[in-house]
């Protein structure tokens, strides 16, 4: 039986990180985690990482699609935070960001790691950005690298 599993080291991978500015005080922690994971664990060279800032989580899919279509990147890491408020806005933004990023991955056939926090309150967001619940930015970066390696293995198999 042949078993394919990805690894998280990818020193030559070209990675785009797309980050929303809205809720930047949380997103910057996600970014720190993602960059640390890419460089320290994934051994990705600094010159192989491109950072793109967008206004909010709703804008992530369009920019991710443009980056994917450029064929310059092996994977995209999308980072942002959507916190539930008193209106339906949360559902629209969170749903469109999630659905849109998934569509980019499927249509462009490139890993798009979902590092967008969708939380009930600010406390949950802070916990997931590097305190009690780990750093979801770092986790998304490692998912991207593992998927790059797994797709390469499938192509060789």
Curated annotation (Swiss-Prot):
The protein's Enzyme Commission number: 2.5.1.78
- What's its catalytic activity? (2S)-2-hydroxy-3-oxobutyl phosphate + 5-amino-6-(D-ribitylamino)uracil = 6,7-dimethyl-8-(1-D-ribityl)lumazine + phosphate + 2 H2O + H(+)
* Keyword Metal-binding listed: no
Concerning Gene3D superfamilies, the annotation shows: Lumazine/riboflavin synthase (3.40.50.960)
Q: Give the pathway annotation.
A: Cofactor biosynthesis; riboflavin biosynthesis; riboflavin from 2-hydroxy-3-oxobutyl phosphate and 5-amino-6-(D-ribitylamino)uracil: step 1/2
Could you list this entry's UniProt keywords, alphabetically sorted. Answer: Riboflavin biosynthesis, Transferase
The UniProt entry, under CDD domains, shows: Lumazine_synthase-I (cd09209)
Query: Where is (2S)-2-hydroxy-3-oxobutyl phosphate bound in this sequence?
Result: 86-87, 128
Methyltransferase recorded as keyword: no
Q: Name one GO cellular component term.
A: riboflavin synthase complex
Q: Where is the active site?
A: 89 (proton donor)
Annotated NCBIfam families: lumazine-synth, PRK00061.1-4
> What PANTHER family does the database record attribute to this sequence?
6,7-DIMETHYL-8-RIBITYLLUMAZINE SYNTHASE (PTHR21058:SF0), 6,7-DIMETHYL-8-RIBITYLLUMAZINE SYNTHASE DMRL SYNTHASE LUMAZINE SYNTHASE (PTHR21058)
What name has this protein been given in UniProt? 6,7-dimethyl-8-ribityllumazine synthase
Name the gene behind this protein.
Answer: ribH
């Amino acid at each position: 039986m042949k078993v394919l599993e990805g690894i998280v080291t990818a020193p030559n991978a070209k990675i785009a990180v797309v980050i929303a500015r809205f809720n930047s005080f949380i997103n910057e922690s996600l970014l720190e985690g993602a960059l640390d994971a890419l460089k320290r664990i994934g051994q990705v060279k600094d010159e192989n990482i491109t950072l793109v800032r967008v206004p909010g989580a709703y804008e992530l899919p369009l920019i991710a699609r443009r980056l994917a279509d450029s064929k310059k990147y092996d994977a995209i890491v999308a980072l942002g935070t959507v916190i539930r408020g008193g209106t339906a806005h949360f559902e629209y933004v969170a749903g469109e960001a999630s659905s849109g990023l998934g569509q980019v991955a499927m249509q462009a056939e490139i890993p798009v790691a979902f590092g967008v926090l969708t939380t009930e309150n600010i406390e949950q967001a802070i916990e997931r950005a590097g305190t009690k619940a780990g750093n979801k930015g770092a986790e998304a970066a490692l998912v991207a690298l593992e998927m790059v390696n797994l797709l390469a293995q499938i192509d060789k198999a």
